[in-house]
């Protein structure tokens, strides 16, 4: 059984909010284990703008958000979960990033307050109808390398057991609208298989879950490749 966890809610006691930290959550692992839970999916905890957020506004992918704890405390939480026989999955957001991300700042059109046309990582405008913050161009070799490096880092440095990918329907450069975005997209399949290869090569037991919601033919091909 897998539960999805957001620290601030989980560590609330009565009318008083606990510190809402990863350290506080670690103290509750015996209780979680007693429920029959064998996997925890953490909502996005890579550094995000502000301190009060669900985490779907990422800005720095190689750092865990300081509002919840230190690098050592995150690692301790995962280690303690593993001692209890609980896998730890991370919700990752690679569809977009905020304007605080260095890649956005490096190539920025200040006149129009948006991504510059020569930005090698972000689209000026999202080609799909799921435009949130600044849209990554997953056809760019630089973006692909960045995402794969980050996945490998999370698996090796923090020992995560897998990932839940947010909004993977947006991993495409093909133009679409609300009625066509779910149609089979071969280029999107290639991109996701490439990311899965990195995950699987780094840790053959790691899982990769997609928030995808596309047509059955695309979903089936991704499932056959090993994704959930």
Feature locations, PLM:
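Conserved alpha/beta catalytic core and glycan-binding cleft of carbohydrate-active enzymes
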Residues: 159, 185-228
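Generic enzyme active-site microenvironment
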Residues: 89, 164, 209
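Substrate-binding/active-site clefts of carbohydrate-active enzymes
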Residues: 4-159, 167-184, 195-203
